Amino acid sequence: MNVALHELGGGGSMVEYKRAKLRDEESPEITVEGRATRDSLEVGFQKRTRQLFGSHTQLELVLAGLILVLAALLLGCLVALWVHRDPAHSTCVTEACIRVAGKILESLDRGVSPCQDFYQFSCGGWIRRNPLPNGRSRWNTFNSLWDQNQAILKHLLENTTFNSSSEAERKTRSFYLSCLQSERIEKLGAKPLRDLIDKIGGWNITGPWDEDSFMDVLKAVAGTYRATPFFTVYVSADSKSSNSNIIQVDQSGLFLPSRDYYLNRTANEKVLTAYLDYMVELGVLLGGQPTSTREQMQQVLELEIQLANITVPQDQRRDEEKIYHKMSISELQALAPAVDWLEFLSFLLSPLELGDSEPVVVYGTEYLQQVSELINRTEPSILNNYLIWNLVQKTTSSLDQRFETAQEKLLETLYGTKKSCTPRWQTCISNTDDALGFALGSLFVKATFDRQSKEIAEGMINEIRSAFEETLGDLVWMDEKTRLAAKEKADAIYDMIGFPDFILEPKELDDVYDGYEVSEDSFFQNMLNLYNFSAKVMADQLRKPPSRDQWSMTPQTVNAYYLPTKNEIVFPAGILQAPFYAHNHPKALNFGGIGVVMGHELTHAFDDQGREYDKEGNLRPWWQNESLTAFQNHTACMEEQYSQYQVNGERLNGLQTLGENIADNGGLKAAYNAYKAWLRKHGEEQPLPAVGLTNHQLFFVGFAQVWCSVRTPESSHEGLVTDPHSPARFRVLGTLSNSRDFLRHFGCPVGSPMNPGQLCEVW
């Protein structure tokens, strides 16, 4: 799918919180588990005073009264001193604590009971104060933080004193500046793409074309310019032999976010109409005649609908053992003869020499077989139009404003966005991140990243890993052999924090982008050079073993991931910031924020897909049958639970989101257990002022407020049919309604919405 069609971010502000009085019910002084409270001290003092009074003279009573007053003053001083010294009975009044307390209070909705709807309780205030910005289909913590990171990068790249010893960093600035040259881009108009189409052999929609050029056009579009018509080809670690890279082929070729948009035509009629109008408008902008262009684009759309029909839904592709098929190129040729695979792959991976025996991993043999049949029965003119349309999709974001305006109309229908107000610089930062993300990351890390954060994050990961492994020991459904192997896998998980080391070594960084030519004069040509360069990088990887230095996210990215073939978890510098993490925030918030993210990624090693990989990152069956059956029974509970949730009357797909739901639930539990272990070692923290929450409760509020989010109905629908994650609301409600710790600390009775009675637990 075109990069520009991915979700757009935005900005907003927090709401001033009108304080509600929850303190009587949940004051840290009263609800702390098992400790003496201020009330109990007062009761004890009153009992002692009664014993002092009896039948005595007036003088004795006066003296006794004076003694009692003095004793009371002395005891008050002692109590005050004790409270001051004991952090569990004092309040944190540092500037950081006051600021974060204010933000938490602004986000809360105290008009809602936490046992009724914890998401609304935690995020209601935030939602009221954060309407969707224009041009955005969703707005959340991740978008806000990415906006902040982009502003930092803008400052770094536009600094007039910019001076770097790294050629890669200089290329990054040149690329960014070329993207900002709106006047030149407008002056060139559609000419750069029209010239490229003519160079490839023409397009039936805009002029003459070579009728015998299917393979040549396929090689150019999918090879030189890295579009993905019909299928996608890439080089990556072999899932069953993770120490080596291998050619991999998978299904692809749809422009809209999901096959559902093509096949459920009644529900998506507006989207399909808007998509066809978009196709026609771009065809006309490139020189086509309106009537002829509409007729031919309708044929291309019908071809995409046929592709959607044979595309396997994501929820049916979760078992990689079943969809992984290793074969030779000659076997692939027999499976899908419409493409000359040796010719195509040899071109794609030039200058490597490939033979018929070269191994290839195919994900979805049935799809490739059917797509081959579809190619063979489709008219050459339609095939040509479809191939060039894929090239057009790939490149129009580098053209003038007319193409962007056409896309905005499609985005409004598809995602519910209004006219975009995204400034050009922000678009250019995103493009630069896509093209030279690690060179950009070098600038970002040197300007912003605190090395101490990396050390603290390392410590947190180890604490969360230990907590997860303790949970393994408590599982009654897992046999000892599988349990031991699971613990070994958890021990072997490799963590990467902040950034790969090579980005701070100028020569190593320059080597990564060696061969990529960048000019400040032509943004379009820079993008073409990037596609060609990425194809060469892919070819270079095939004969090399996978490297841990190859990250799948840039350092400035606000996200994290687990990679099963390396058995590694990665946390870029971009996410190691508030509200996920801050060194001067309470540990309850850090464990509830970045700690849950860490636990989430670690648990992915043991979700329904990650569990298929062993500690070395190889896809193989290492579970005993009885434990596997028990695991599947537990995950079935979670699948059914999430399938009951609805957004705007539309149900979640509990199977599609299963892996992420397992990770959310397991990550929360591991992070909370790690927080409890930290408290046992270091003692209670000072509570935040005014929030009226124990630190245990604060952990869960911190977790929930990370997911405060607003979204258009159209974007919500898109998420339900494409996203492996549950919607933000149910990432909170689903996870916490399965947490015994949450239910205990908030006292939610069985039968309340947050405590339906049946808990689904996997890890």
From Swiss-Prot:
Sites carrying a glycan are: 159, 163, 204, 264, 309, 376, 532, 625, 633
Query: Where is the Peptidase M13 domain positioned along the sequence?
Result: 91-763
Q: Which InterPro entries match?
A: MetalloPept_cat_dom_sf (IPR024079), Peptidase_M13 (IPR000718), Peptidase_M13_C (IPR018497), Peptidase_M13_dom_2 (IPR042089), Peptidase_M13_N (IPR008753)
Membrane topology, from the record: Single-pass type II membrane protein
The residues annotated as the active site are: 601, 664
| Residues annotated with Phosphoserine modification | 27
Please give the cofactor(s) recorded in the UniProt entry for this protein. Zn(2+)
- Listed as disulfide-bonded, the cysteine pairs are 92-97, 115-748, 123-708, 179-428, 637-760
Query: Hey, what's the signal peptide range on this chain?
Result: none
Q: Looking at the UniProt record for this protein, which Gene Ontology cellular component terms does it annotate, in alphabetical order?
A: Golgi membrane; trans-Golgi network; transport vesicle membrane
Q: Which amino acid positions bind Zn(2+), per UniProt?
A: 600, 604, 660
Question: What effect does gene inactivation have here?
Answer: Eef1akmt4-Ece2 and Ece2 double mutant mice are fertile and healthy, and do not display any abnormality in terms of growth or aging.
Stretches of the chain found on the membrane's Lumenal side: 82-763
The stretches that face the Cytoplasmic side, renumbered to this chain, are: 1-60
What catalytic activity does the UniProt entry give for this protein? Hydrolysis of the 21-Trp-|-Val-22 bond in big endothelin to form endothelin 1
Q: Where in the cell is it found?
A: Golgi apparatus membrane; Cytoplasmic vesicle, Secretory vesicle membrane
UniProt keywords (A-Z) are: Cytoplasmic vesicle, Disulfide bond, Glycoprotein, Golgi apparatus, Hydrolase, Membrane, Metal-binding, Metalloprotease, Phosphoprotein, Protease, Signal-anchor, Transmembrane, Transmembrane helix, Zinc
Q: What Gene Ontology biological process does one annotation of this record name?
A: peptide hormone processing
Note accompanying the cofactor annotation: Binds 1 zinc ion per subunit.
Gene Ontology MF, one: metal ion binding
According to its UniProt record, the EC number is 3.4.24.71
One Pfam short name: Peptidase_M13_N
**Residue spans crossing the bilayer:** 61-81
Show the PANTHER family listed in the entry: EEF1AKMT4-ECE2 READTHROUGH TRANSCRIPT PROTEIN-RELATED, ZINC METALLOPROTEASE FAMILY M13 NEPRILYSIN-RELATED
What family classification does the UniProt entry report for this protein? Answer: Belongs to the peptidase M13 family.
Q: Please report the name of this protein according to its UniProt entry.
A: Endothelin-converting enzyme 2
Species of origin? Mus musculus (Mouse)
Give me the gene this protein comes from: Ece2
